């Protein structure tokens, strides 16, 4: 399978495809899909023993501020297998900067055709407050024990802000 052949979404920016690299609640291992080989590589064993609070991946054929595809956290009732592509709906964005520059994370839920569990979630604020705190806490701290690495959380944005970031990254990819 070639992730480069997968479009960014079915109905951008409301209906996106996300290639999952790290499942929710998984061991503290950072996986990355290599953009040249489409293979799932172990990027590193995380020094901080924390797990991703939601499935983590990227939107194919996008280019974010950090030079990588746009990152997405997909909240699901079960962990999604790495390498899978899930159809999702953006509900918010976590703006942050790290040692590599701007590194925003789109927050999404499964498309309504995949699950009715999130049909009433239109904005990130419709998700449980504890989950939002867990996401923020994870990204504030997951690099704490890695020398020279840091993260600064700049705040949350709504679904419109997430959709704007998606379109910006799609246009940046097109060049």
Swiss-Prot record:
<feature type="binding site">
    <location>
        <position position="103"/>
    </location>
    <ligand>
        <name>Mg(2+) 1</name>
    </ligand>
</feature>
<keyword id="KW-0378">Hydrolase</keyword>
<feature type="binding site">
    <location>
        <position position="71"/>
    </location>
    <ligand>
        <name>Mg(2+) 2</name>
    </ligand>
</feature>
<comment type="similarity">
    <text>Belongs to the PPase family.</text>
</comment>
<keyword id="KW-0460">Magnesium</keyword>
<keyword id="KW-0963">Cytoplasm</keyword>
<feature type="binding site">
    <location>
        <position position="44"/>
    </location>
    <ligand>
        <name>substrate</name>
    </ligand>
</feature>
<feature type="binding site">
    <location>
        <position position="56"/>
    </location>
    <ligand>
        <name>substrate</name>
    </ligand>
</feature>
<protein>
    <recommendedName>
        <fullName>Inorganic pyrophosphatase 1</fullName>
        <ecNumber>3.6.1.1</ecNumber>
    </recommendedName>
</protein>
<dbReference type="InterPro" id="IPR036649">
    <property type="entry name" value="Pyrophosphatase_sf"/>
</dbReference>
<feature type="binding site">
    <location>
        <position position="66"/>
    </location>
    <ligand>
        <name>Mg(2+) 1</name>
    </ligand>
</feature>
<dbReference type="GO" id="GO:0006796">
    <property type="term" value="P:phosphate-containing compound metabolic process"/>
</dbReference>
<dbReference type="InterPro" id="IPR008162">
    <property type="entry name" value="Pyrophosphatase"/>
</dbReference>
<keyword id="KW-0479">Metal-binding</keyword>
<dbReference type="Pfam" id="PF00719">
    <property type="entry name" value="Pyrophosphatase"/>
</dbReference>
<dbReference type="GO" id="GO:0004427">
    <property type="term" value="F:inorganic diphosphate phosphatase activity"/>
</dbReference>
<feature type="binding site">
    <location>
        <position position="71"/>
    </location>
    <ligand>
        <name>Mg(2+) 1</name>
    </ligand>
</feature>
<feature type="binding site">
    <location>
        <position position="30"/>
    </location>
    <ligand>
        <name>substrate</name>
    </ligand>
</feature>
<feature type="binding site">
    <location>
        <position position="142"/>
    </location>
    <ligand>
        <name>substrate</name>
    </ligand>
</feature>
<comment type="subunit">
    <text>Homohexamer.</text>
</comment>
<comment type="function">
    <text>Catalyzes the hydrolysis of inorganic pyrophosphate (PPi) forming two phosphate ions.</text>
</comment>
<dbReference type="GO" id="GO:0000287">
    <property type="term" value="F:magnesium ion binding"/>
</dbReference>
<dbReference type="GO" id="GO:0005737">
    <property type="term" value="C:cytoplasm"/>
</dbReference>
